[in-house]
């Protein structure tokens, strides 16, 4: 495989590393890993208390980039639970569901190789109104994520779309910002209701391995 090469996010990653040096985050924390919907979750530390949270979402990122920077902003933290949300940007840029599933599978492999007790809370893609033409491919990716979770007890798949949709499957008008892409405050509140139970279960599952 060719070495990962991207300079697009160098400043973001360098900023994370500077923050880590100035204020080293705890080992065995809850880690947010993925794209901007995680990065922009302003109330996350409060919403997921009392778990220590490290948010390493970076805007516009694809699974290639999250994988590429794993050695710098995922693995060094030895996280206890990772909430992973990425893949929608890949598909929006023309990538296939199969390619996204393969990269998420590789992310899981590398995470567990470095940190055998880590748990993964794998969020679905977001079928946002502005990306309607890509929904079918996103749903294929989600089915792959669901299958990955079914094959690995340490992965919990969470489909966030039902929480963001009306009963007929159309997006709720109140859960997205004006860009029809990123979650609003109401959107994050809806997501929290389905993500928090999975995080609680994952944290509990690692109690013995992460006892001080």
PLM features: what roles do these ranges have?
Residues 1, 211-212:
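Polar low-complexity intrinsically disordered regions
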Residues 1-78:
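Serine-esterase "nucleophile elbow" of acetyl-processing enzymes
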Residues 46-51, 68-211:
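Alpha-helical cap/lid subdomain in secreted, periplasmic
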């Amino acid at each position: 495989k060719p070495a990962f090469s991207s300079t697009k996010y160098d400043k973001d990653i360098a900023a994370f590393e500077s923050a880590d040096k100035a204020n080293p985050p705890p080992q065995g924390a809850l880690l947010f890993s993925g794209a901007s919907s995680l990065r922009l979750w302003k109330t996350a530390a409060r919403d997921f208390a009392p778990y220590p949270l490290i948010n390493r979402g970076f805007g516009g990122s694809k699974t290639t980039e999250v994988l590429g920077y794993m050695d710098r902003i995922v693995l060094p933290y030895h996280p206890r639970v990772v909430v992973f949300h990425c893949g929608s940007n890949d598909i929006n840029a023309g990538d296939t569901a199969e390619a996204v599933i393969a990269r998420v599978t590789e992310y899981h492999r590398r995470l567990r190789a470095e940190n055998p007790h880590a748990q993964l809370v794998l969020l679905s893609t977001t079928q946002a109104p502005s990306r309607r033409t890509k929904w079918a491919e996103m749903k294929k990716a989600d089915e792959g994520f669901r299958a990955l979770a079914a094959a690995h007890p340490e992965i919990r798949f969470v489909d966030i779309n039902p929480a963001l949709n009306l009963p007929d499957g159309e997006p709720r008008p109140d859960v997205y910002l004006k860009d029809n892409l990123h979650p609003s405050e109401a959107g994050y509140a809806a997501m929290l209701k389905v993500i928090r139970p999975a995080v609680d279960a994952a944290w509990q599952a690692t109690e013995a391995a992460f006892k001080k």
